[in-house]
A protein has these predicted regions:
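An interfacial alpha-helical scaffold signature
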Residues: 1-255
Length: 255
């Protein structure tokens, strides 16, 4: 149960009949309003808490076939959001299992101090995830406009001209320049928003994204942070795409 950071959903698997599906760790004094929530696997009223000293772990019977179906992903997330509304929570990634109550209590006891400390740090906070992209065509035009070497090599290799070495050199130069520009953009955005966050985690972006960053924000500043992110996005104008999600359970700040 120690691996609590977000990760891709697991492949379909069969769980032993007595296995438990794990949702989150909270303090044992958390209200734990679980009534009406649907468990992963579609069972209503199956959620409960296993307590160990100052900690509690929200569980339900594991479904026989654990698959990342949309309804189960939604059920997992709904539990996190209900818990987060009432207090600090350490959300588990989708698909985490434990053999039985005894194993859960042992896991809670084994990292009791760490979990209690982390719950204190995450009290009254939420995660915001921001992804941002810029059109690669725009970036390429910028490289060719601002880099004499890139422009010269591009002209030399246009219409099939130049040597193989010229084409390789152009490709390598453009790739480096794109990385530099994307990194610079990411640093600018993170620098602007970090002032309003208690913490940040920057992950590797995918595709044309130049940014994939998560910010830990005090819940009292959630609207302020959202507004600042929207204003920042508007300032970059056309050619940029910003995608903000939140408030979310603080998956990125558990480990």
């Amino acid at each position: 149960m120690s691996n609590t950071s977000p990760s891709p959903a697991p492949s379909p698997s069969s769980a032993p009949a007595s296995s438990l599906y794990i949702y989150a760790i909270t303090g044992s004094d958390h209200p734990l309003r679980l009534d009406g929530l649907r468990a992963v696997g579609g069972v209503s009223g199956a959620l409960r808490a296993v307590t160990g000293g100052p900690l509690a772990c929200v569980v339900s019977p594991a479904p026989p076939e654990l698959r990342p179906k949309r309804r189960d992903l939604a059920a997992h997330q709904e539990v996190q959001e209900r818990l987060m509304a009432d207090g600090a929570v350490l959300p588990m990634r989708f698909g985490m299992l434990a053999p039985d109550d005894t194993a859960v209590v042992a896991a809670l006891d084994g990292k009791r101090a760490e979990y209690v400390h982390r719950l204190g740090e995450l009290h009254a906070t939420a995660e915001f995830n921001l992804k941002a992209a810029r059109s690669q065509d725009d970036l390429l035009r910028e490289v060719l406009t601002e880099s004499d070497d890139a422009r010269r090599l591009n002209e030399r290799t246009r219409d099939g001209g130049g040597t193989y070495a010229d084409r390789v050199a152009l490709g390598e130069l453009v790739a480096r320049q794109l990385d530099v520009r994307r990194g610079r953009l990411a640093d600018q955005v993170v620098g602007r928003l970090s002032e309003m966050a208690r913490g940040k985690v920057v992950a590797s972006p995918a595709g044309e994204d130049f940014l994939n960053a998560s910010f830990l924000v005090e819940r009292g500043r959630a609207e302020e942070f959202s507004r600042a992110a929207r204003q920042l996005a508007q300032g970059y104008g056309a050619g940029y795409e910003f995608r903000l999600r939140g408030p979310l359970p603080p998956y990125s700040f558990v480990a």
